[in-house]
């Protein structure tokens, strides 16, 4: 059991299993960050494509006319710019979360376990593939290193 303090306030005791759960709870969302960022970038690209098509050329008339600047285009552009700014802010938040996780993993004393955590949670490899990255250790040994690293990670989260 470990006493947990947050901001000088006593929060109670956590056992090893709870500390490991806290570490996994923190790291699990990190696995999806690259996918989330890619989808946000795709969303921004689609918004840009939609924006450029607002002033499209009208071929349905006898005389071809350009889209010009229809009334309300300024509002659409403004909304687009606001949405892009929001999405860019979300990308920054996700990037910061990933960088924080990397920094915390790098600070672990359990280096073999840290390698496993990096491959599994930061680089989004399967657990089995992450175990292989530490070299000639059995799966059982690799699991122990991972659990030691998760326990250390959990302790550092609650300190």
Residue ranges and their predicted role:
Residues 97, 111-113, 145:
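N-terminal positioning helix adjacent to the helix-turn-helix/winged-helix DNA-binding module
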Residues 135-156:
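DNA-recognition helix of helix-turn-helix
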Residues 88, 123-129, 146:
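Topology signature of small-to-medium multi-pass alpha-helical membrane proteins
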Residues 1-107, 159:
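N-terminal interaction/assembly modules
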Residues 124-140:
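Helix-turn-helix DNA-binding module
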Residues 93, 117-118, 146:
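Hydrophobic, well-ordered secondary-structure scaffolds
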Residues 108-125:
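Short amphipathic alpha helix immediately N-terminal
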């Amino acid at each position: 059991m470990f006493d947990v303090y947050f901001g000088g306030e006593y929060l109670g005791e956590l056992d090893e299993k709870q500390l490991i759960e806290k570490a996994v709870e923190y790291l699990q969302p990190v696995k999806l960050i690259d996918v989330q960022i890619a989808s946000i970038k795709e969303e921004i690209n689609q918004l840009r494509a939609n924006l450029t098509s607002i002033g499209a050329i009208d071929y349905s008339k006898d005389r071809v006319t350009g889209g010009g600047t229809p009334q309300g285009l300024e509002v659409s552009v403004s909304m687009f710019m606001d949405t892009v700014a929001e999405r860019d802010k979300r990308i920054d938040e996700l990037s910061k979360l990933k960088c924080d996780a990397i920094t915390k993993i790098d600070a672990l004393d359990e280096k073999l376990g840290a390698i496993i955590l990096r491959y599994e949670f930061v680089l989004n490899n399967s657990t089995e593939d992450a175990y292989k990255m530490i070299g000639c250790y059995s799966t059982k040994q690799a699991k122990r290193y991972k659990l030691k690293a998760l326990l250390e990670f959990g302790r550092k989260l609650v300190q």
